[in-house]
Amino acid sequence: MSTKLFVGSIPLSFNNEILKKTFEKHGTVLTARVMTDRTSKKSRGFGFVEMENTSDAYEAVKALNELEIEGKSIVVNETR
């Protein structure tokens, strides 16, 4: 069963591909999406990643939550 994760405080330079590659180190990523402003198309600083299974999602949260990337500590947790 897949598990969806919220990813907050991501660098504004991140796009879908960078987000996916960041999480692929911890399991199979089904989808990765950086949320963007409808008008400007610029990153809003958060996104969502869907991992193939719960154990991969758990490993990703454990490894990446509060990890510093480009001077920002990202937030990773399971969506509710």
Region spans (language model):
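Canonical RRM/RBD RNA-binding surface and closely related RRM-like beta-sheet modules
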Residues: M1-E78
